[in-house]
Amino acid sequence: MIRVAIIGYGNLGRGVEFALRQNPDMNLVGVFTRRAPETVETQGATAYHMDDLLVKKGEIDVCILCGGSATDLPVQTPEITQYFNTVDSFDTHAKIPEHFAKVDKIAKENKQVSVISTGWDPGLFSLNRLYAQSILPQGETYTFWGKGVSQGHSDALRRIDGIADATQYTIPNTEIIERLKAGEKLELTTRDKHLRECFIVLEAGADEVAIREEIVTMPNYFADYDTTIHVISQEELNKNHKAAPHGGTVLHTGVTNESTKQVIEYNLHLDSNPEFTASVLVAYARACVRLANENQFGAYTVFDIAPKYLSPIDVETLRKELL
């Protein structure tokens, strides 16, 4: 039985608790939080304060870290990896090499295993980009996200004066995807690949015209995209736009000779982004513990781990039933 601790209990931590119920070879030791444990409403797991984590060291095989990539994981993953095997979902792509190097050093010094940057992007999408480019080296890879809720863009909307609440959807340009699948070679801009759709609730007396202008001209978020804005009531937003669906496509178009076109496509359609991401983390937590049991200490990404380590099924059965 693999003994698991959840570190942090937001949407992702809650998703890990759900996922562990579907994996009978795993047991949840508890949730560890910086909040007062008695205020944390879990789905049944015992909540402890983070200060109690080291006290439980002998009862935990792996910690699944469920904090954010901006401020939590750059500190928590190296810190906790001094004492435990760890898995995180660090997703700041540009900083992954730096994060890996820091965690790898600590993991090797302390004889631990840490699997970083798991999830679906980075994670499963990363694997599919690697497979596609290795198999069809003469080609182009495209990644499309959505349709789904972007938490970062929704937060940016909510920071605008006059907006009481908001949800933003990232929508892939399906026409472009179909043209690429048909073999067209396209030079694509940011605006070509994705659309943005905003549902906003205005505060009383807010200037709708000014707010619309502020949204469509916001650099790094909306200025480079075709953006549609809907003003709705809080009731409608709560009813129709508070879920966390997401998904995306990795598309690789290539050739095996001058006249033979080949397309590799991988899709996700998710009703809950955090619950799916959590399920990926749990599978890689199993791999993490297995690598630790083999004394293969250090940091790993999805590129480094053989698929057999993810499955609860023994490799002989995998060869017989899945190969």
Model-derived features: positions:
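C-terminal substrate-binding/catalytic lobe of Rossmann-fold NAD(P)-dependent oxidoreductases
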Residues: 3, 14-15, 22-54, 149-285
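Rossmann-fold NAD(P) dinucleotide-binding segment
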Residues: 53-62, 70-89
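NAD(P)-dependent Rossmann-like dehydrogenase/reductase catalytic/cofactor-binding core
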Residues: 262-323
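Rossmann-fold NAD(P)-binding glycine/threonine-rich loop
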Residues: 90-114
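General beta-strand structural signal in soluble alpha/beta enzymes
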Residues: 88-89, 114-118, 144, 167-168
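Glycine-rich Rossmann-fold phosphate-binding loop(s) that bind the pyrophosphate
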Residues: 9
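Oxidoreductase and adenylate-handling cofactor-binding alpha/beta cores
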Residues: 124-140, 155-165, 287
